[in-house]
Amino acid sequence: MSKQVVNSPLSLLGELKQRRNTYEKRGLSTGWKKADEFMSLKKGYPIMIGGYAGSGKSEVAFDIAINSSVDHDWLWLIVSPETGDQFEIMEYLIEKVAQGKHIGKKYQGALSDSEYESIVKWLHKHIRILDRQSGWDDVFTGLDFSLKNLFEVVENVEKQLKGKFDGIIIDPFNELDLNLGGNIAGTVKDELDALIRYTKKNNYLTILTNHANNRHEIQSKDENGKSFFWKPPATKEEWAFGQQFARKGYQMLFVYEPPMQFQHLQRNEGNIDFMESINNNYNVREILCQKTKPKGVGKTGKFCLHFDRQNQRYYEIDSLGMKKQIKYPKL
């Protein structure tokens, strides 16, 4: 029977009963207790991560992929031209799982060959990479790199794998082939509609990163009474193509690096996240949950993560200021 455009409640009853068996408002854990208060990993819905250049939004997306692979045994497809080609992305991931050891053999404290191969085998179980830089244009000659085309390619890849991806990272939005010569709002709307449609259709968790437009700087006083200028976080409407993102977004996160002067002011008021940050070369990021949808999946607000530069991973601290353990696979 063909699908109906208009349906009655009773015509949907059979599928509604099936959905009750697995119905959950919240998704799965992110791997960070503080983050779980505000967000969750719910399949069938996209997460959008915004931020200024260099703020660490790609790092957050990649860490979510690793945490969910460790905790939930997920399989991810990563599309990240901004990170690099397939080899650079793989080395980036290996570093994140290497627990601080160097991947280059010439360095002291480098991974052994067996450790290196064990990490690659674990990543093989959980990660696939679509290489825009040296793959797409050669394999799909003349095919625009749009979200619709991307998801159609992904569906064909799944047939070859004889399996399905749990999550897909697309990093960032501006790497798509967007026709911005005419109706820009319409073009962006069509791309986001495709993201939502295929995410729901295939029950993925998709993560789409996006840059934010620069805001006007604000003048404030530091702890010594000296003036400094700083840039506040962008609102969701101030992301690149923000009107469409704000309308179409489900879970929208903004990764923000607070200015050093602001961190000192907050530390002086007893904020333990900023104490930790200042003691670790200003490694804090505020994650602002600017929109949450569907109801129950999370809530608006903010939490803090800290970037461990040696391990190339985000961590959180507890209420006593103690560093919580980073998620690593058992190799």
What is each of the regions a protein language model found here?
Residues 1-21, 53, 105, 120, ...:
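C-terminal regions of RecA-like/P-loop NTPase motor modules
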Residues 2-100, 246:
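The Walker A/P-loop phosphate-binding site
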Residues 14, 72-182:
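Conserved inter-motif catalytic segment of the P-loop NTP-binding fold
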Residues 48, 166-171, 207, 253:
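Structural motif
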Residues 78, 169-170, 204-211:
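Structural recognition of the conserved hydrophobic beta-strand(s) that form the central parallel beta-sheet
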Residues 81, 211, 257:
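Cofactor-binding loop segments of dinucleotide-utilizing enzymes, especially the Rossmann-like FAD-
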Residues 182-196, 205-206:
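A short alpha/beta connector and helix-capping loop motif
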